[in-house]
Regions:
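Low-complexity, Pro/Ser/Thr- and charge-rich linker/hinge segments at domain boundaries
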Residues: 664-683
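Terminal connector regions
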Residues: 624-668
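Conserved, compact domain cores that house catalytic/ligand-binding motifs in diverse enzymes
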Residues: 678-746
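Glycoside hydrolase catalytic-domain context in secreted enzymes
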Residues: 1-629, 643-648, 652, 751
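In a subset of proteins, long, contiguous C-terminal domains/tails are tracked
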Residues: 527, 543, 547, 577-579, ...
Length: 751
């Protein structure tokens, strides 16, 4: 044993090292107890602890777990735009892990919502990588601040459930770097998650678990990741290849440790690589020892329920509020229609399914608060046809009410881990019920329960108010009552565009793929990056959300702070008679670019609570990355010189003010050669001078003159200069030779 407090890889035999790279059972590390390395528990939990009651036996049961606080899934939390609140959720989750002796909680999942039909959208954050990364980092930092580990997942490009165990996500390098990697990258660089879970799918033909470029070259060497990488459950198909790629831990165990031993002995695994992977597992255990050594700890159930309550309040997005139908007056005659009001859908299905410590429905909350309301279920929470008797009862109940609160949405069978949705619509029987009620009473507020966006446009005309409540966790009932009756103002903002029609989504042409692959043909134009760039009509834009208050944004100023950095300031004022919160959003719009870029991209946001008449100055620092795109030519981030517009507003389509900043650019340039086009020479700082010389020498009669008309200039622009002889015969050869010779002289002088 070494002199350190805990064993290191140098204290282990080859067999013991190999054993650390596989689990002990479905929910435990293997450990080496004889060397003082315990086999701690790891378990599910993107939005709360799901410790299966069968965990002690190593079995899996998705619906039978110890009671834990069920916080709103990421579909709701993401709409809070409140990283500080999300950090508190993370802290609470960690405390519950400490009580249950869970060393690592498996989450958060930060895969991009490429398509709203994705079956797991309820536990992912956004269509925007900046928002996803800057929110989900709160879970990671909050959990790990208490000495419990997280598992950032699913790395990478796990954006659908259809064929997820084997599908190849075929994605350009630029789209990976700009859309599918940044949330992971930001969290790695700012919070260092103790574990990362690789995805099931292949990326450009290579399984994530066996992808050394992904797990080592990018994750560790480029981003500086210090933790371990584990497989998703059953995603490791070749232990030797995966370990060599940078996978520390296979889960669950395949009981093939001998494969690692044999490979280490015959040279297929280098000793240093096995040592690195095993030492990573020891380091993980050591990080969690203190928290796992706390005995008789009990978390505060009520305090955690209050965190869930606040999270649920801030998760709701008010989409429509005609005639100020919300908030509802305390003395109003209220009808509540919809089974969701009595039997709430508070979480998604699959591995994140939690047994809550408490559960209070909206109807229970009304009763507890002494609010009188008539109720009719209206429909059943299944995919069966409409029940005429339930419909008739609901219409009669709603007929004479001052306000009808209709709870509509997706039943659990409609969205879950394991399959993708087939439609954006809510069940037809619910829409027909809404229309029937609206025929008798126009004062309707629809309260939606769903894990991903649903079509609103087909039925929105039948309601004066629409409150998107997502899946609110265990405290959704009280939170809904607080918002609906005006105790608090809604403050949520959409983290995902609501399209007019699912076929408007740019990914639909390649969704969900075919014959084992899906081509991400939309490239970087995901979500609002597509809709806003191509001016497509949407139902509700990214970042949108109404309030009971009104706000004004002014005093926007952008100051250049470096060659390619800027500082943004703005003042936001509550101009209403309601205390409320507003989220100010900053977008960066490029000017002229060498590649196709989105119209604008989110690069900053700040949620601020303001009392009536109160103002606050807020500021944002935009680093070089905020202005950059991934250049496949340079294989690196690239900032072009020129003007950029900084937009400040409250959604991607509600911009209050803009300011322009001129950047120097990063000066990147590839050496020019005979295969560089005439246009590339003309755009290059050095090449442009040589192009000018070509025209000047032609005027002087020292070189053949280039054709000088609009058509030929366009023709030349995309022509490599070694093709000019095809256009001008010997004259083209002379021009090409002159350009290359002049370039060589300049390069020689620079050296």
């Amino acid at each position: 044993m070494s002199d350190t407090a805990y064993p290191s890889v140098n204290d282990l035999t080859l067999e013991e090292k190999a054993s650390l790279t596989s689990g002990g059972d479905a929910w435990h590390l293997q450990g080496v107890e004889t060397k003082g390395i315990p086999g701690y528990m790891i378990t599910d939990g993107p939005h709360g602890l799901r410790k299966s009651l069968a965990s002690s036996t190593g079995e899996t049961d998705l619906n039978d777990s110890v009671p834990a606080t069920c916080f709103p899934p990421a579909a709701g939390l993401s709409s809070s735009w409140n990283p500080e609140l999300i950090h508190k959720v993370g802290e609470a989750m960690a405390e519950e892990c400490i009580q249950e002796k869970v060393a690592v909680i498996l989450g958060p999942g930060v895969n991009i919502k490429r398509n709203p039909l994705g079956g797991r959208c309820f536990e992912y954050w956004s269509e925007d990588p900046y928002l996803a990364g800057h929110e989900a980092v709160g879970i990671v930092a909050g959990v790990q601040s208490k000495g419990v580990g997280t598992s950032l997942k699913h790395f990478a490009a796990n954006n659908q459930e259809t064929d997820r165990l084997r599908v190849s996500a075929n994605i350009s390098q630029r789209a990976l770097r700009e859309i599918y990697f940044p949330a992971f990258e930001h969290i790695v660089k700012t919070a260092q998650p103790w574990t990362i879970m690789c995805s099931y799918n292949r990326i450009n033909g290579v399984h994530s678990a066996q992808n050394r470029w992904l797990l080592t070259d990018v994750l560790r060497d480029e981003w500086g990741y210090e933790g371990i990488v584990m497989s998703d459950w059953g995603a490791d198909h070749d232990r030797v290849a995966s370990l060599n790629a940078g996978l520390n831990l296979e889960m669950p165990p395949s009981y093939t440790d001998d494969q690692i031993v044999y490979a280490a002995r015959d040279g297929r695994i280098q000793p240093e690589q096995l040592d690195r992977m095993a030492q990573g597992m020891i380091d993980l255990v050591n990080k969690t020892r203190a928290a796992m050594s706390v005995d008789d700890y009990r978390f505060d159930v009520d305090a955690h329920d209050e965190v869930a309550h606040q999270a649920a309040i801030e998760s709701m997005v008010l989409l429509k509020n005609d005639d100020d139908i919300l908030p509802v007056a305390a003395n109003a005659k209220i009808a509540v229609i919809g089974e969701f009001a009595r039997t709430p859908r508070y979480q998604g299905g699959g591995s994140s399914h939690i047994t809550p410590t408490k559960m209070t429905s909206f109807l229970d909350t009304l009763a507890a608060r002494g609010v009188d309301a008539a109720f009719a279920p209206g429909f059943t929470l299944d995919l069966e046809p409409a029940d005429a008797k339930l419909e008739a009862e609901a219409v009669e109940t709603a007929k004479n009410a001052d306000v009808v609160l209709m709870f509509l949405g997706l039943p659990e069978a409609a969205e879950s881990e394991g399959f993708d949705r087939e439609t954006l619509d809510i069940p037809a029987k619910q829409v027909e019920l809404l229309k029937a009620v609206a025929a008798e009473n126009k004062n309707i507020v629809v309260v939606l329960s769903n894990g991903s966006v649903v079509s609103v446009a087909p039925w929105a005309g039948n309601a004066k108010g629409i409150l998107e409540s997502w899946l609110l966790g265990q405290a959704g009932g009280p939170a809904l009552a607080d918002v609906i009756f005006g105790k608090v103002s809604p403050s949520g903002k959409l983290a995902q565009t609501i399209p007019m029609d699912i076929n408007d989504d740019p990914s639909m042409i390649n969704w969900p793929g075919e014959e084992g692959h899906v081509d991400y043909g939309e490239g970087v134009f995901v979500g609002y990056r597509y809709y806003d760039t191509y001016d497509k009509a949407v139902d509700y834009p990214f970042g949108f959300g109404l309030s009971y208050a009104t706000f004004a944004i002014d005093g926007v100023n952008v100051a250049k702070t470096g060659a390619n950095t800027a500082h943004v300031t703005a003042t936001v004022t509550n101009t209403s008679d309601v205390d409320a919160a507003e989220t100010v959003q900053v977008y960066v719009a490029p000017g002229k670019a060498a590649v196709a870029r989105p119209k604008h991209e989110l690069k900053g946001f700040r949620k601020v609570f303001l009392k009536v008449g109160e103002s606050a100055e807020i500021s944002f620092d935009l680093d070089e990355r905020a202005f950059a795109y991934w250049s496949e030519k340079f294989d690196d981030w690239h900032v072009e010189a020129g003007e950029y517009t900084v937009e400040v507003g409250t959604s991607s389509r509600d911009i209050a003010a803009v300011a322009v900043v001129t950047l120097d650019g990063d000066g990147k340039a590839l050496p020019l050669d005979e295969w560089s086009t005439f246009g590339e020479w003309a755009d290059d700082p050095v090449g442009s001078k040589i192009v000018a010389s070509v025209y000047a020498e032609g005027e002087a009669g020292n070189l053949p003159q280039l054709p000088d008309n609009d058509m030929m200039r366009m023709f030349l622009k995309s022509m490599p200069i070694n093709s000019m002889p095809m256009l001008m015969s010997d004259g083209g050869k002379a021009i090409t030779a002159f350009m290359l010779d002049e370039y060589a002289k300049i390069a020689e002088t620079a050296e």
